[in-house]
């Protein structure tokens, strides 16, 4: 399934994987998964984290390695219930729930994920998605960007 991904997608997923793989050992543990999810405002139980890992842990060693992560991402991209996932993701970014993602909100989430971005980089991300030029990202613009990935 992962063989249907482009080189660009694989390199983006490698970057995402390294955000989760806090100690850089090539495996995502339940602890690391929990850290990232909590930084995004989620509060999964230990059992839920274990279930998430087990879902993709092909070799049964209790962690997710990069090939397993790629398969998960490839499956997720095929998912038909992505509409709900997109709404959920938008809500994570839209801290004040006003229907828009501001530069400050984008910076906040990216910082929580361990991505230190300059103001220019954040502004560039906003500009790329900001079709109507109002300086923030509405849901339609967010969906366009996410679907283009």
From Swiss-Prot:
The modification N-acetylalanine is found at residue 2. Ca(2+) 4 binds at residues 130, 132, 134, 136, 141. Ca(2+) 1 binds at residues 21, 23, 25, 27, 32. The keyword Calcium applies. Ca(2+) 3 binds at residues 94, 96, 98, 105. One of its GO terms (molecular function) is calcium ion binding. Pfam families: EF-hand_7. Ca(2+) 2 binds at residues 57, 59, 61, 63, 68. Keywords: Acetylation, Calcium, Metal-binding, Methylation, Repeat. SUPFAM superfamilies: EF-hand. Residues 8-43, 44-79, 81-116, 117-149 form the EF-hand domain. CDD domains: EFh. The modification N6,N6,N6-trimethyllysine is found at residue 116. GO terms for cellular component: myosin II complex. It comes from the Eukaryota. The keyword Zinc does not apply. InterPro entries: CALM/Myosin/TropC-like, EF-hand-dom_pair, EF_Hand_1_Ca_BS, EF_hand_dom. Calmodulin mediates the control of a large number of enzymes, ion channels and other proteins by Ca(2+). Among the enzymes to be stimulated by the calmodulin-Ca(2+) complex are a number of protein kinases and phosphatases. Belongs to the calmodulin family. This protein has four functional calcium-binding sites. This is Calmodulin.
């Amino acid at each position: 399934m992962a063989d249907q991904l482009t080189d660009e997608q694989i390199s983006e997923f490698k970057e995402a994987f390294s955000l989760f793989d806090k100690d850089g050992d090539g495996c995502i543990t339940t602890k690391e998964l929990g850290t990232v999810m909590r930084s995004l405002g989620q509060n999964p139980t230990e059992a839920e984290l274990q279930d998430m890992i087990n879902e993709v842990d092909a070799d049964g060693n209790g962690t997710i390695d990069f090939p397993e992560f790629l398969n998960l991402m490839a499956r997720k991209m095929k998912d038909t219930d992505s509409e709900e996932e997109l709404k959920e993701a938008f809500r994570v970014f839209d801290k004040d729930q006003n229907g828009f993602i501001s530069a400050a909100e984008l910076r906040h989430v990216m910082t929580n994920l361990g991505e230190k971005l300059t103001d220019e980089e954040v502004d560039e991300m906003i500009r790329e998605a900001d079709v109507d030029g109002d300086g923030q990202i509405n849901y339609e613009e967010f969906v366009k960007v996410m679907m283009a990935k």
